Each structure stands twice: as structure tokens, then as C-alpha cells.
Amino acid sequence: MRMTVIPIVILCGVLSVVYAVWTTKSVLDADQGNERMREIAGYIREGAQAYLTRQYLTIAIVGLIVAVLAWYLLSAIAAIGFVIGAVLSGVAGFVGMHVSVRANLRTAQAASHSLGAGLDIAFKSGAITGMLVAGLALLGVSIYYFVLTSVLGHPPGSRAVIDALVSLGFGASLISIFARLGGGIFTKGADVGGDLVGKVEAGIPEDDPRNPATIADNVGDNVGDCAGMAADLFETYAVSVVATMVLAAIFFAGTPILESAMVYPLAICGACILTSIAGTFFVKLGTNNSIMGALYKGLIATGVFSVAGLAVATYATVGWGTIGTVAGMEITGTNLFFCGLVGLVVTALIVVITEYYTGTNKRPVNSIAQASVTGHGTNVIQGLAVSLESTALPAIVIVGGIIGTYQLGGLFGTGIAVTAMLGLAGMIVALDAFGPVTDNAGGIAEMAGLDPDVRKATDALDAVGNTTKAVTKGYAIGSAGLGALVLFAAYANDLSYFAANGDTYPYFKDIGEISFSLANPYVVAGLLFGGLIPYLFGGIAMTAVGKAASAIVEEVRRQFREKPGIMAGTEKPDYGRAVDLLTKAAIREMVIPSLLPVLAPLVVYFGVLLISGSKASAFAALGASLLGVIINGLFVAISMTSGGGAWDNAKKSFEDGFIDKDGVRHVKGSEAHKASVTGDTVGDPYKDTAGPAVNPAIKITNIVALLLLAVLAH
């Protein structure tokens, strides 16, 4: 089985990378526009590459220490797995950003010809990042699994293979949390600081070249939404596939179906890469000029093709009949196929729900715009109300997904649903990475003084880009929540396995019964401790953005004060100073909060062990803390990302001209618009820093707990 399916899976991963290379050539061959556009894009490119180089250097230092620890505490193959996960995650983000900072001016230039041409370049740029994320993640896991089992000769379900693959997921997780948090602090420090002085104090429009923070804002779009999201979804993809393979190794140990069950998630991802590539060719602007409609055509085509891909993957690996029993439940290939379908349906519903809560001209966004008419305070109140309300429907969908898949295929069925969800990652990341390119294109059009019709086209693309970014975050959080649940299942089952084999693993000998009962005070304590982590983490992230934004406010005011010619247009702002200031702030502020979810499981386990003297109580508290992180993290992340997206598009409503309930039209520069800018400055760090960074924090706590078990077993 492995000998036939794995090479095909690897070939699918290679095709994804080949598609990305071919599309890169197509994007880079497009017209770059006039000299002024090239000059502005050059500033953005230099700033983004300088920031990312410094960020990766910082991560490399931390990563090197962790790799040495993995080698010492686990094994050489675990350390190599960690390095593979970290390096490939970094490469996906770096190459994606490398293309996006070159596609921005080409999109602006293409938009000067037609809206469709602008959409084509921006989407292709996003598709490059998307296919690299899916392709490199699949190649990393499948090739390393093949090497471990076929070249090094480890049995597929052995602890050596499981530990090495979990370490690969940990490598991706560590990059992800740093990239998400660091990129988020940079981008929102620039955005909020620049808006407060530029729009509110000086009364100049967004992306005005007189604002010294403008270039930093455009740099931030790339390092946050392109490189950051790429690392985030790479990690979710790799971690969820690995977790599902770990469950297969536990549930089907010693049965003939073991290898097929472990390869099944890889086969699903391989098939879905092909369907995602096919889906990209359906993104074309129709006669109604609906940009969202064009993007949805591609997403719907990918989803429909993925049903067939899922069927082929199921038939080629586990077949349609009975494959074994999980927790006394008979599992069939047909049931697992339906679990995959549930994953695709959950994805579709989360996309639709998130678009409803963040899309322009929808009730939630209109309610915030209407609240802006009566002032700043009412805007913030209504924005918070929408952010809280937006958690209900996604949570109900996720609950339905969990129960439905558990009834069909047990916890392994839930893992297959998450794998099918992440099979669509190539197309979903393409929709997300489309956002920063269109945002930058609008900035370049404004700064280069292009025709107002060009700015109108880029604004239309950017408004959709805001929604696609929010939709992608909803998808990333939903899949992360389900993925973390699969990781928790792996933790609980690993724990049972070690406890049942105490003679082989002496640390776990005679530890007694491990109970997750709520009557156990250590379980309740663990739940509460885990529950506080997303809030504390989010609070630290918001504080970091506030500090960075304050520094930018001071810097922009200083430049306006010391260079009066800037506002008159006779002096050039010092763009590099703001970029450098933010780079230092983001790198400095990202390290401590990033270590919080890494260290939390260790604090819980060893803290409870020290207090209670019972290993069973410590493991129960640790397991409960993982559930606390998953549940609270899910709600915190959804409320922040959807609420922030709604605030942003409420502000956009005024830029297009918002007609309130009394029929009065409010435009850019009006008092209502100023109130919406205040809401947007609150929503920005909500949706682009704290909310998205909670996502990898949820998974990293679960992975560290899994690795802790492996270390103790050694």
C-alpha cells in the first residue's frame, strides 16, 4: 500500500510547487507600471524583506535551542523532524511574501486597464502562496514518513515514527506563532499609529504619501497577512495531518489496515491539492463584475472536485468496507468518506457565516456603520456586540461537525474531517494572500497619483480582500479548533497507551487511574488555567500593538513638526525610520507571549505534580488545561477576527458613501466616518494580531503536551 500511494502523494506535492513556480513566472512577466510606482514598491519590498530577515534570525536562534533539546530529550530523527517543519514553514511564508511584494504594483498597473486584469494578477499571487503552503506541508510530512518507514526501516506505527512526525508539527508551530504575532504587531502598529495621526489628526486620506507611516503600513500587510497566514495554515495543515496519523497508529495498532489508515490522510491531501489547482482556473470575473462571485466560483469548484478526490483517496487506501473497530465502534471506509464530506460542509458553512458577519452591505457591518452616526462610543459598543454575536453560529457548526463525525467514525472520523477541511488550504490561502496584494495595490495607486478610476478599482478589490482575509481567519480558527481536539484525543490515547504499558515505559508504571471527571479538583483547576491562556495571550498581544502604535504616533508627529514641508508636499517623509522602529518593536514584543503557550503545559504538569505528589492528578490537570485552551481560544479568536473584520468594513462603507436609516448620506471625512475610524483602530489589532495569534497558541499547547509524554516515556 505505502509503495503505491506514497509516491503518488509526493507527486501531488511536487505538482503544487511546480504550479507555484509557473504562476510566479506569469505574475513577474506582467507590466510594472511607471517609475514612481516602481520606486514606491521598492520601498515596500525592502522594508518587508528587512523585517522578515530579522524575524527569521530571531526564530532561528530559538529554533536551534529547541532542536538541540529535541535531539537530547527524544532522538536525532525527532530533532530532524522539528527542523524540517520549521524550515518548510519559513520557506512557504518567505517565498509567498517575495511574490506578493512584487505583485502589488503589477496589480495596480493591471487595474488601470480593467478590474478583471487587476483581479487576475492579485489572485494568481495569492494562489502561489496557497499552493506552496499545501505543497510544502504535504511534501514535508509524506517524504519524512516515507524515509522513516521505507529507508530507515521503522515500523509505521512505532513510537519513533510518531515522535518524529509530532516534532515536525512542533517545528511548524513554533514558526507559526512567532510569524503570526510578530507580523501582527508590526502591521497593526503601523496601521493604527498611521491612522490616528494621518486620518484623525492631520485629516489626510489613507495611503497618502505625506504620511511617514504609509510605507510601514504596506510592509505590514505583507509580513502579517501573507507570511503570517502562510505560516499559520502551514502549521494547521501539518499538525492536523500528523495528529490524524497518530490516531490511526493508536487505533489500528497491530491490524493489517494500520499502514493504509496512516496513509489515508496524506492521500486526501494529495487529491485535494489537484482539485485546488483545478479550482484556480475557475476564478474569472463575470459579466456582473462581482469580485467575490469570481473568487467563490473557484472555491465552489474546488469543493465539488474535492468530493470526487475524497472518494478516490478512500478507495485507493482503506476501501469502502469495514476496516476495524474504534472504542467498540465498527469503522467502514464509507463512513470515513462521509466524515470527509462533513469536513467540506463545515468549511463551506464557516466561509458563508464569516462572510455574513464581515461583508459590506450585510446586517452586522451596516449596524456598526449606523452606530457610527451617533458617535465614537456607540460604534465601539456595536462593534463589540457584533464580535460577541459572531461566535455563536461557527461554534454550533463545529459542535455539529464533532458529533456527526464521531457518530460516523469515532475520533479518527473527526481527524479525517479536519484533514478534508485542510485539503482546501491551497485555495483558502490563495483567497487570503489576495488581500495584502490588493491593499498594497491601492496604496501604490494613491501614492503614485494614478487616475481616480484606478483607485476605485483597487478599492473594490481591497474591500473584497478584507472579507476574504476575515473568511480565511474564520476557516483557520475553525480547522485549528477541530485540529486541536484531534491533538487532545491523541494526548488522551497516548496517555492510556503509556499507562497500560508501564513495564516498557517505567515512568508510567503504577500511576493509577487517570480521571478527567469534573469531580476531580485538579481537572477543574486545569480547565481554569487553560482557559486563562487565550485571554492573557490576547491581552499581551493587544498591549504590544498599543506600544508599537504609540511609538509610531510620536514618530509621525515628530516628522510633521520638524519637517513642515511634508504637509506642503515640498519635503519627503523618512519612511525608513518608521519601518525600522516597528521592526525592533515587533521582534522585541513577540518573544515573551510566544513562549507562554509553549511553557504553560510544563507549568501545569510539574506544578500539579509538585503540589499533589500524584502523576495521575498532574496528567489529568494537563489534559483539562488543553481543553480549556481549545474552548476559550476558539471563542476569543472568532470574536476578535470577525469583530475586527466587521469594524474595518464598516469604515469602508463610509468611503463608498453610507446612507443611514433616515436616508442621510455620510461620506469620507464626515463625523460618522471619523467615528468608524476609531472603531477600526480598535478592530485592527483584534483581527490582525491578537485573534489570529491565538490560533497557533491553541495547537502549540497541545503539541507540547504530546511531546512531554514522549519525553517522559523516554
Curated annotation (Swiss-Prot):
Q: Does the keyword Membrane apply?
A: yes
Residues engaged in binding Ca(2+): D648, D680, D684
Q: Where does Mg(2+) 2 bind?
A: N218, D221, D439
**Site entry: Important for ion transport:** R180, D225, D232, D688, K699
Q: What is its EC number?
A: 7.1.3.1
Q: Which GO terms describe its cellular component?
A: acidocalcisome membrane; plasma membrane
Q: What are the TM regions of this chain, as residue ranges?
A: 52-74, 85-105, 128-148, 166-186, 238-258, 263-283, 298-318, 333-353, 383-403, 411-431, 470-490, 522-542, 591-611, 618-638, 693-713
Look up the record and name the cofactor or cofactors this protein needs: Mg(2+)
Residues that, per the record, bind Mg(2+) 1 = D191, D195
Q: Catalytic activity annotated for this protein?
A: diphosphate + H2O + H(+)(in) = 2 phosphate + 2 H(+)(out)
Q: How does it sit in the membrane?
A: Multi-pass membrane protein
Q: What class of enzyme is it?
A: translocase
Signal peptide span per the entry? 1-20
Residues flagged as site, Determinant of potassium independence: K469
Q: Where does substrate bind?
A: K188, K687
Q: Where in the cell is it found?
A: Acidocalcisome membrane
HAMAP family associated with the record: PPase_energized_pump
Name the protein family.
Answer: Belongs to the H(+)-translocating pyrophosphatase (TC 3.A.10) family. K(+)-insensitive subfamily.
Main role? Answer: Proton pump that utilizes the energy of pyrophosphate hydrolysis as the driving force for proton movement across the membrane. Generates a proton motive force.
Subunit structure comment from the entry: Homodimer.
Task: Tell me the protein's name.
Answer: K(+)-insensitive pyrophosphate-energized proton pump
Which species?
A: Agrobacterium fabrum (strain C58 / ATCC 33970)
